[in-house]
């Protein structure tokens, strides 16, 4: 008999006791009960905390922070510790840089958004470095290579990712559909198996100059190392369960992800991803405390999503100004200071 428990402890005890006895569950009720508990109390119940945690978009104005930076504080080669996360200002294609970032550790999941090699233009047709008609005044490194140079660049990055990750790693690799062949060549060259394409369906279109139809999606390659078995959190085990799912649960299994874009004027990068986008990937392909690798940090969306879901993000960014943006974003959200590693 357990006595002298406060309300949270009593609720956690009831859930844990029933779970130990393998009781039948009304999962909707369980989730509602879990939502009333603090994070540390959820852990003692034996239930997966991912059941109830949903990522929240932060209010950070990445574009304003980027524009306000006159001279970056970060320098090439700098490494920062952001709580459990690591951030390096370095080159993802250079093996030595990635080795320093990983610090002897291996990642279990990859979620990364490399330059698409499309020489991004603003809606007005100007280079993305222009501030007119939607440009940021910055530039995207490695976004205008020849096909051969781009294949070589992607291949180097993918070899590095393979070297510094576990054998059961899953990779999510965003790309531009017009360069599908380049990405597939690089996957093949670096011995990655490409399993399927995931589609991010946006709530608004992108004006696509020179194309018959405007684009409203971005594709992502899902894969793993050839001849290896990748990890996946398999919550649905049989067809009967699928037919009993609510739509909100069922859609988590689909290869089309509908997530709203960030407001375009807030973009610090043209392919910037909302924090909710990595959520289902992180829950499907990693566990709490796993290391998630992102070698193209951008504005820090992967790192911030990992932070909310108790994963550790090891991320690389070549542009020192973006490194400063990521640090400011983390510090604003957590109230903690980044430290030089």
PLM regions and their residue ranges:
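Short alpha-helix adjacent to the SAM-binding motif of class I
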Residues: 321-332, 336
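SF2 helicase/translocase NTPase motor core
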Residues: 339-341
